[in-house]
């Protein structure tokens, strides 16, 4: 019987064969069963799984802010109160997800490895457009699972050094990619979040202003959508907030987000209409 390891102390031949710089393509050739979309053939639609809810992204001159609530739901139940749905993609981009929590987390981990693998193989980073296209291909690969109820859609944002600005890309479950010029929201509370952003967005926002209206949009979404979690001041659970600028990716600490939440609550206390 042939040794699958190619002999004692040797890597399998697949690791030694020159090929693509895409980790996803490599995985599809060497271990396709590990890809998120390769586990189709379920007996029927799946419903009793945790779902992540609302993500928002807002551009400002020189960068972009992304923020996400912390709630995951399972039917009418709160499955988790401290989910992290906004993540570092690479040094100059971030990604969030809405939909099936397990599939979303797996998709993001694979995307992070995809970008890191390309950089190590090629010695250069992908352009922001190329990163967005790679993510679209991965979303398309999950389509069989999405059609059986395990849908997930990402929101991707980053800093484009060629244009010196932040950019936002959204997707549907069939991997159609759209660039959003100013702001975007995905998830169950997105219609309320976008309504909030529409009222408050300005082209001359400062970075602090962008953080404020992103958190406020999540607050508005939570006010009308039961699947979106608002700031939990008792448990000290606040939205995940990240920025991407020419200085790179930065996640805001809870000690930075808490004063923003406190100011919003104080303002709402004196202006009940929001």
Curated annotation (Swiss-Prot):
Top EC category: hydrolase
UniProt keyword annotation of Hydrolase present: yes
Primary localization: cytoplasm
GO molecular function: threonine-type endopeptidase activity
Keywords: Autocatalytic cleavage, Cytoplasm, Hydrolase, Protease, Proteasome, Threonine protease, Zymogen
Organism superkingdom: Bacteria
Active site: 53 (nucleophile)
Catalytic activity: Cleavage of peptide bonds with very broad specificity
Location in or out of the cell: Cytoplasm
GO cellular component: cytoplasm; proteasome core complex, beta-subunit complex
InterPro entries linked: Ntn_hydrolases_N, Pept_T1A_subB, Proteasome_sua/b, Proteasome_suB-type, PSB_actinobac
Pathway in which this enzyme or protein is active: Protein degradation; proteasomal Pup-dependent pathway
Residue ranges listed under propeptide: 1-52
Gene Ontology biological-process entries: modification-dependent protein catabolic process; proteasomal protein catabolic process
Pfam families: Proteasome
Activity modulation: The formation of the proteasomal ATPase ARC-20S proteasome complex, likely via the docking of the C-termini of ARC into the intersubunit pockets in the alpha-rings, may trigger opening of the gate for substrate entry. Interconversion between the open-gate and close-gate conformations leads to a dynamic regulation of the 20S proteasome proteolysis activity.
Known EC number: 3.4.25.1
Family: Belongs to the peptidase T1B family.
Physiological role: Component of the proteasome core, a large protease complex with broad specificity involved in protein degradation.
Oligomeric form and interacting partners: The 20S proteasome core is composed of 14 alpha and 14 beta subunits that assemble into four stacked heptameric rings, resulting in a barrel-shaped structure. The two inner rings, each composed of seven catalytic beta subunits, are sandwiched by two outer rings, each composed of seven alpha subunits. The catalytic chamber with the active sites is on the inside of the barrel. Has a gated structure, the ends of the cylinder being occluded by the N-termini of the alpha-subunits. Is capped by the proteasome-associated ATPase, ARC.
HAMAP family attached to this UniProt entry: Proteasome_B_B (MF_02113_B)
Protein name: Proteasome subunit beta
Native species: Frankia alni (strain DSM 45986 / CECT 9034 / ACN14a)
């Amino acid at each position: 019987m042939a040794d699958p390891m190619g002999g004692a102390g040797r890597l399998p031949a697949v690791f030694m064969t020159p090929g693509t710089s895409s980790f996803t393509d490599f995985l599809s050739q060497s271990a396709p069963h590990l890809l998120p979309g390769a586990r189709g053939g379920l007996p029927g639609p799946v419903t009793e799984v945790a779902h992540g809810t609302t993500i928002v992204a807002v551009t400002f001159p020189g960068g972009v802010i992304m923020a996400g609530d912390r709630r995951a739901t399972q039917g009418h139940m709160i499955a988790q109160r401290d989910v992290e749905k906004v993540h570092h993609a690479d040094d100059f981009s971030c990604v969030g997800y809405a939909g099936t929590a397990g599939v979303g987390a797996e998709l993001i981990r694979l995307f992070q490895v995809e970008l890191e693998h390309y950089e190590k193989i090629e010695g250069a980073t992908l352009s922001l457009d190329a990163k967005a296209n790679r993510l679209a291909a991965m979303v398309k690969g999950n389509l069989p699972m999405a059609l059986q109820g395990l849908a997930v859609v990402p929101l991707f944002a980053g800093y484009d050094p060629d244009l010196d600005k932040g950019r936002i890309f959204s997707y549907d479950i069939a991997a159609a990619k759209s660039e959003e010029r100013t702001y975007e929201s995905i998830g169950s509370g997105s219609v309320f979040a976008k309504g909030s952003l529409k009222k408050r967005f300005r082209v001359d926002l400062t970075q602090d202003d962008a953080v404020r209206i992103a958190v406020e949009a999540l607050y508005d979404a939570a006010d009308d959508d039961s699947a979106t979690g608002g700031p939990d001041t008792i448990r000290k659970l606040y939205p995940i907030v990240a920025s991407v600028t020419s200085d790179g990716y930065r996640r805001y600490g809870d000690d930075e987000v808490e004063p923003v939440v406190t100011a919003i609550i104080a303002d709402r206390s004196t202006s009940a209409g929001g």
